[in-house]
Amino acid sequence: MAGPQRRGSGAGGGERRDRKGRDGGASAAEKTAYVERVVAINRVAKVVKGGRRFSFTALVVVGDGDGTVGVGYGKAKEVPAAIAKGVEEAKKNFFKVPRIQGTIPHPITGEKAAGVVLLKPASPGTGVIAGGPVRAVLECAGVHDILSKSLGSSNAINIVHATVAALQGLQRPEEIAARRGLPLEDVAPAALLRARAGAGA
């Protein structure tokens, strides 16, 4: 009698392990739905009565690689916890980036604090011509062809926020045409017109 009971208990444990494994797999799939880039990790200190208390900060960029991106800043006593907080904040700061065939609709300059970043559209096949912090934001946003140049501070935090400011300032050709009272053909890039013509054909 004891033998069958042990086998039954083992089977039940196996089922529980299987269920746990399936649940864990689902959560892992959800986590990999976004592209995450850790741009900078710094150790900071707070002076208290007993001495100095150290913690870590993490600047994280998260996006879906298809026009949605956000930036977050996390702080914790351990690096993994700081990164996790940064990821959660980045998801709360998601915004949409207008794109045309993998690039941006028009040139734009973004400024934040001492950071200044210039972004220019590029033809297909150019790739992402950008430094580390700018590249992280653009790749997470799903921009594949672009030219960029940092004109201000070399601080990674300022550069990332200047890049975000530039992307948030982008306007769709339809919005520009409506504001100016002009036909779309007068303001839209040639790439957009070719893409629409091809889709119509």
UniProtKB/Swiss-Prot annotation:
SUPFAM superfamilies: dsRNA-binding domain-like, Ribosomal protein S5 domain 2-like
Disulfide bonds: none
GO BP, one annotated term: translation
Alphabetical list of InterPro entries matching this protein: Ribosomal_Su5_D2-typ_SF, Ribosomal_uS5, Ribosomal_uS5_bac-type, Ribosomal_uS5_C, Ribosomal_uS5_N, Ribosomal_uS5_N_CS, Ribsml_uS5_D2-typ_fold_subgr
Domain S5 DRBM: 34-97
GO cellular component, one term: small ribosomal subunit
GO molecular function, one term: structural constituent of ribosome
Taxonomy, superkingdom: Bacteria
Compositional bias of kind Basic and acidic residues: 14-23
Alphabetized Gene3D superfamilies for the sequence: 3.30.160.20, 3.30.230.10
UniProt keyword annotations, A-Z: Ribonucleoprotein, Ribosomal protein, RNA-binding, rRNA-binding
Region (Disordered): 1-28
Function: With S4 and S12 plays an important role in translational accuracy. Located at the back of the 30S subunit body where it stabilizes the conformation of the head with respect to the body.
NCBIfam families named in the record: rpsE_bact
Comment on protein domains: The N-terminal domain interacts with the head of the 30S subunit; the C-terminal domain interacts with the body and contacts protein S4. The interaction surface between S4 and S5 is involved in control of translational fidelity.
Protein family according to the UniProt entry: Belongs to the universal ribosomal protein uS5 family.
Subunit structure: Part of the 30S ribosomal subunit. Contacts proteins S4 and S8.
Protein name: Small ribosomal subunit protein uS5
Gene for this chain: rpsE
